[in-house]
Amino acid sequence: MQLLEERILTDGNILGENILKVDNFLTHQVDYRSMKAIGKVFAQKYAEAGITKVVTIEASGIAPAVYAAEAMDVPMIFAKKHKNITMTEGILTAEVYSFTKQVTSTVSIAGKFLSKEDKVLIIDDFLANGQAAKGLIEIIGQAGAQVVGVGIVIEKSFQDGRRLIEDMGIEVTSLARIKNFENGNLNFLEADA
């Protein structure tokens, strides 16, 4: 997605050897116009897939996921990273390791929001090692629902996340694919959409 790549080059900051900070439009402050455009691209890509739910993980995946759900006219569910006292029964859970935060969390979704009839599109802000997507795939599987695809805003293609998901037989659609960080710059691979 050309618009997204341009935005990353303009507003992204490289931290160290493998961290991209995009907090001014995606991970802290949200540029709703960009998120709306991203949501439309995912909706067009999966228009014929019969998607019934969009699922993400809190927090930075929520903005692109809600705009994708809006464009598809389906509900959006986000997995919670912290136990909530109001979630008392029928909870679906998985362990997820966060590359950025260097911590493992138990993420959860109330089972009443997913059924075996659902066709789910997972949306997330970043794909690095694939652990967030893997955890969501496990949760969706516990409900008997089908994961149709995983939509990623920014993929770090030099890490193993794509391979992990594709080895599970699930399609990955990334709107920006980073090949590497080199001398304070980043290089892109061709995006999936």
From Swiss-Prot:
Binding site for xanthine: L20, T27, K156
Predominant place of localization: cytoplasm
This protein's GO CC annotations: cytoplasm
Binding site for 5-phospho-alpha-D-ribose 1-diphosphate: A128, N129, G130, Q131, A132
Keyword terms of this UniProt record: Cytoplasm, Glycosyltransferase, Purine salvage, Transferase
The protein's annotated pathway: Purine metabolism; XMP biosynthesis via salvage pathway; XMP from xanthine: step 1/1
Compartmental location: Cytoplasm
GO biological process, one term: XMP salvage
Enzyme Commission numbers on file: 2.4.2.22
Catalytic activity reported: XMP + diphosphate = xanthine + 5-phospho-alpha-D-ribose 1-diphosphate
GO molecular function: xanthine phosphoribosyltransferase activity
One Pfam family this sequence matches: Pribosyltran
PANTHER family reported for this sequence: HYPOXANTHINE/GUANINE PHOSPHORIBOSYLTRANSFERASE, XANTHINE PHOSPHORIBOSYLTRANSFERASE
Protein task: Converts the preformed base xanthine, a product of nucleic acid breakdown, to xanthosine 5'-monophosphate (XMP), so it can be reused for RNA or DNA synthesis.
Assembly and oligomerization: Homodimer.
Matching HAMAP family: XPRTase
Family: Belongs to the purine/pyrimidine phosphoribosyltransferase family. Xpt subfamily.
Name of the protein in its database record: Xanthine phosphoribosyltransferase
Organism for this UniProt entry: Streptococcus pyogenes serotype M49 (strain NZ131)
Lineage of producing organism: Bacteria, Bacillati, Bacillota, Bacilli, Lactobacillales
